[in-house]
Amino acid sequence: MVDNTQLYDKILACWIGKNIGGTIGGPVEGRMEILHFTDLPDVSGGPLPNDDLDLQLVNLHALEQRGVRVTARELSEEWAEHVHFPFDEYGYALANMRRGLAAPLSGFYNNPFTDCMGSPIRSELWAVLFPGDPERAVRYAAQDAAVDHAGGEGMYGEMLFAALESMAFEETDPVSLIRRALAFVPRDSRVGSAVRDTLGWFESGVSYEYVREMILSGYGNRNFTDAPQNIA
């Protein structure tokens, strides 16, 4: 178990790191070529706005208002009240809510984006709420993902990330963390398969350029937000 000081440091690092990643990556989101960052953006005005973080604050608000046993249906009610993003899976889920469909139907019905990254990118909250307890982190991640990714690879991506991030409070070896996290997603999922293949290529010692080409060959998708290619 980590002590309170370590816990605070890791949670703070998680939130700051998420802001850094979004601020650097946000301006080039959707570009498909290999990117080499040599200069950092001007952050004198603070980090860029980031829906990855905004939605986690909505979920945190749901927990504060409704208690820790919050369900997918209750999370979808929070979305209906506080979320107004029109794009991709968010927009389809919100349209379904306006039809009267709560989660998980809000995330499943007529939604072509269930396999995308909208839910994996908001997994950190469940890890920091349940550090060292991946089972509970995954359970909440699944409830969250059902709001806009029910039945899709996006749900498995959020579950994988929540497990890995929760265990990272006590484990520091990246390969070990990835292998352990894979136990929390279906073996026949594309997310799980893509990550296992990528581990194999990494351990064979080939270049990252080759690994990238293999990922795109086996799991590539014209939609840049498709989860398996991004997570791998």
Residue ranges, per PLM feature:
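An N-terminal structural lobe/cap that precedes and organizes the functional/catalytic core
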Residues: M1-V58, L75
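Accessory "access/gating" subregions that flank catalytic or transport cores
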Residues: V2, L7, I11, M97, ...
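Conserved phosphate/anionic-ligand binding catalytic regions in large, soluble enzymes, centered on
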Residues: W15-G26, D115-R122, D226-N230
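Active-site cavity-forming subdomains of large catalytic enzyme subunits
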Residues: I16, P47-N50, L55-Q56, L60-G151, ...
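Solvent-exposed, non-transmembrane amphipathic alpha-helical segments
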Residues: R31, H36, L40, S44, ...
